[in-house]
């Protein structure tokens, strides 16, 4: 990534100049959003100018504790069978790819795709996340995939978390059969509208906070809240998805040290590679709320070194076009010292009792009795208007609906199969499908 310092250019119309600068920032922001944290750090470290910055040097050179589960950006060959970990017992489900008609690509990630699929026996629609085992093993991410599965199994009863119907695997792929949500990513709607009015932002923030509070009650820290991971359902309610970076078994006073997340939303303590706790999720909620109100994350800069420095050192700047309650909430959530951050003492209870949420009846919110401020107006499962054409225009790979011929199964595929023992899951027969 090229580090550039923007120069001031005089313009006769100050309003136009500011607008042009905002559009340029938004354009750069959209291009960088799909970059993974590892790629981001690699490009940052490869830039000689950025590496001279003291805060960047601190980020790149700090050595984490030995027990830290670091995300390894250096590809390595799949481990040998003797190094495989049995990642949990499970029943052997009867599900297989040929049970589905795979209709459209509706999302993409580092390890595979998300597809709209229709089950052939009952014609119900699902979002099926299909991941390549070899790609996961190459980056040593099998623990994160199993963590996602485990978290999904715990989320089936919460209204604002995507539900897992079942999971299964073939010799070379993993399949998550998930709720199909077609109201679009929050990121997609922010791209189109740039920012939201405060009542709409409050509604979304409340539903997000409810979902995070539920995860925390299960001792799960989400760690990757961003508009791309927040979906709208067909009525306009929030659905949180993508649990690959969740950390399980974090007690109320517990901490972890894994360096992971999305660059624009990393809390200061994560950047410093210090132990962090549940309050990283409240920092991210503040960042997303700020973005909903203003159009960009709070400390965003096209200069990557400057952005990290802003997160660590720059005071929060709030424009006057929001209420005092919104200002107070953002100041509490985006507190750089986690011990002073809103939510540090009493977690979700502090958030929902904040005056910004005083118009919210939380019981009605969780019962979905509150009318969403925006209705996606989808006409049915085949209505894909809120998905990015970059995805939906892509052809569905033929390999998605089948497994390798048994005669062509290689040793690496065999090792991949052993790495994901316990992945497959099927519910009790009376709830199956």
Curated annotation (Swiss-Prot):
Q: Does the keyword Lipid metabolism apply?
A: no
What does UniProt list as catalytic?
224 (proton acceptor)
Protein kinase domain residues: 100-357
Q: Where is the AGC-kinase C-terminal domain?
A: 358-433
Sites where the protein binds ATP: 106-114, 129
- Extract one GO molecular function annotation from the record: ATP binding
Major subcellular site: cytoplasm
Parts forming coiled coils: none
Q: Where is this region: Disordered?
A: 66-92
**UniProt-listed PANTHER family:** RIBOSOMAL PROTEIN S6 KINASE
Name of the protein: Serine/threonine-protein kinase Sgk1
Name of the encoding gene: sgk1
